[in-house]
């Protein structure tokens, strides 16, 4: 079980559960076609974001495999929500997890995605005792691949025409990091 003490603090960011009051800030980036291009959903309306906050993003703990924890990423200096990150608990027996992230393009290029995702990796390895964490992405999303590489994750798979996404077959990349590798980096 994982029950973090919130907020989770990094050098420049706070990570905390997503609140209903975050809906407008989240909609600002999740309603953009360029942001949603590589995501498994289309652009979201304010109503759809609000619904997700009360359902998909409602967990504040992870109690069993199959659950996910979505956290708001807040810039400490301004108090502004800059994105969200997610930790999936994929398999208890194999101690497997997955990370994901979405950042408002207004905050790209500052290293926030790497900083926030590093905090998620720490939660997964230190808090949940995971052995392996992966990141999966559309192969065309080179910016996302760079994030995972900066975190020390290695490319383990390139699946050709693996997913039918938004009317086209897309390639998928899978990056991974083992707990021991994480410990050597931190």
Q: What annotation goes with each model-predicted range?
A:
Residues 1-37, 54, 70-186:
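Acyl-donor (CoA/ACP) binding surface of acyl/acetyltransferases
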Residues 27, 41, 63-65:
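Short, surface-exposed helix-loop/turn micro-motifs enriched in polar/charged residues
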Residues 36-45:
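A short gly/proline-enriched turn/hairpin at secondary-structure junctions
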Residues 45-66, 72:
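Active-site rim helix/loop that mediates acceptor-substrate recognition in acyltransferases
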């Amino acid at each position: 079980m994982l029950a973090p003490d919130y907020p989770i603090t990094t050098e420049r960011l706070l990570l905390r559960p997503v609140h209903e009051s975050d809906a407008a800030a989240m909609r600002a980036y999740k309603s953009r076609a360029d942001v949603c291009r590589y995501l498994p959903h289309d652009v979201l309306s304010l109503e759809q974001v609000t619904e997700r906050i009360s359902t998909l993003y409602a967990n504040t703990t992870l109690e069993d495999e199959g659950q996910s924890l979505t956290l708001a990423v807040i810039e400490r200096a301004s108090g502004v929500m800059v994105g969200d990150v997610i930790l999936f608990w994929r398999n208890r027996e194999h101690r497997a997890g997955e990370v994901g992230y979405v950042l408002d393009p207004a905050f790209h290029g500052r290293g926030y995605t790497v900083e926030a995702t590093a905090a998620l990796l720490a939660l997964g390895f230190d808090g949940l005792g995971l052995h392996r964490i992966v990141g999966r992405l559309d192969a065309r999303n080179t910016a996302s691949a760079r994030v995972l590489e900066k975190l020390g994750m290695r490319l383990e798979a390139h699946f050709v025409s693996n997913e039918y996404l938004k009317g086209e077959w897309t390639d998928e990349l899978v990056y991974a990091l083992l707990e021991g590798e994480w410990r050597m980096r931190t």
